Amino acid sequence: MAAPCVSYGGAVSYRLLLWGRGSLARKQGLWKTAAPELQTNVRSQILRLRHTAFVIPKKNVPTSKRETYTEDFIKKQIEEFNIGKRHLANMMGEDPETFTQEDIDRAIAYLFPSGLFEKRARPVMKHPEQIFPRQRAIQWGEDGRPFHYLFYTGKQSYYSLMHDVYGMLLNLEKHQSHLQAKSLLPEKTVTRDVIGSRWLIKEELEEMLVEKLSDLDYMQFIRLLEKLLTSQCGAAEEEFVQRFRRSVTLESKKQLIEPVQYDEQGMAFSKSEGKRKTAKAEAIVYKHGSGRIKVNGIDYQLYFPITQDREQLMFPFHFVDRLGKHDVTCTVSGGGRSAQAGAIRLAMAKALCSFVTEDEVEWMRQAGLLTTDPRVRERKKPGQEGARRKFTWKKR
């Protein structure tokens, strides 16, 4: 029984082998005929993918192109703002002609109350010129060429301005060398008073030029203007420099000066108050005296044993060169010795303003004698040893 089984299995395996060879040959023939067509199709698909992969739009990717606003768009927004302003004035029962931006802000805060802490997230109604940023006009012609020769620097207005300032400096140096050759150069240099004005800050300069500047660009521009201002420039150059300065209101004009009072004997005095931390002081400075200072009825040298605290009290008189010319009576309460000395110094400096000139008041303000110290003791934090100090860390 074993031999027929072997022969039958061999016949079956032989038939399977012949069928497999035939099917493989047929497949190879079909592959040879279809291979060129498949290769061309695959190549075309690869090329198609290669050329179309870059034009597939990406989702949820913000565009880096800056949004532009046309003049017609801005005009339309201004018209809508004026119409909304009239409606808002009528709703609030106000006159639309005298309805200012402060009234608009007050009305918006009343009609749309918001508890958001971030003020920029609250509803606003501003003029379109404040909402939409300023933009440049078209900088190139119909042929695609830019109008300005510094267009490809990326900051044409900035570099054009730097070129103008440097050209002025070269002209001034040339003029000075010409005068020096003829011995006509003046010996005295003219000093220009720049008190009461400041340079444009970086954001203001960017708004003027409608360009983004780095900190280095801003510093180089200010340094060049300062060099031009310190040189012997004329009226035209000085007027050019003033375009980049803004006037500042002097604090001395806002400083409240205590009026001079008179006691029963007819002696003039001035009274003022001061505070530092939790200490509060009141000082009476007499117009004439020998330099005696009493604190709570005690001489200041006995009340303040530390030399540093005594120097704090004497500094306002030393600053305006009036040591030994005024008598002072002070009362102070609260705080420690250092805080009490600071409160008394502030009170005496404010009272002393009644007997000095306006220029000396401004000098005292710039020295910080008329400014209240806002610093207070920082609170202890939970989980810490102090306000800033942490507990000692131990591994075990």
Curated annotation (Swiss-Prot):
SUPFAM superfamilies the UniProt entry points to: Ribosomal protein S5 domain 2-like
Family matches, as Pfam families: Ribosomal_S9
Keywords linked to the UniProt accession: Acetylation, Mitochondrion, Ribonucleoprotein, Ribosomal protein, Transit peptide
Classification via PROSITE patterns: RIBOSOMAL_S9 (PS00360)
Compartments where located: Mitochondrion
Region (Disordered): 374-396
GO biological process, one term: mitochondrial translation
Gene Ontology CC annotation, any one: mitochondrial inner membrane
Residues modified to N6-acetyllysine: K287
Single GO MF annotation: RNA binding
Family statement drawn from the similarity comment of this UniProt entry: Belongs to the universal ribosomal protein uS9 family.
Subunit record text: Component of the mitochondrial small ribosomal subunit (mt-SSU). Mature mammalian 55S mitochondrial ribosomes consist of a small (28S) and a large (39S) subunit. The 28S small subunit contains a 12S ribosomal RNA (12S mt-rRNA) and 30 different proteins. The 39S large subunit contains a 16S rRNA (16S mt-rRNA), a copy of mitochondrial valine transfer RNA (mt-tRNA(Val)), which plays an integral structural role, and 52 different proteins.
Name of the molecule in the record: Small ribosomal subunit protein uS9m
Species: Homo sapiens
Lineage: Eukaryota, Metazoa, Chordata, Craniata, Vertebrata
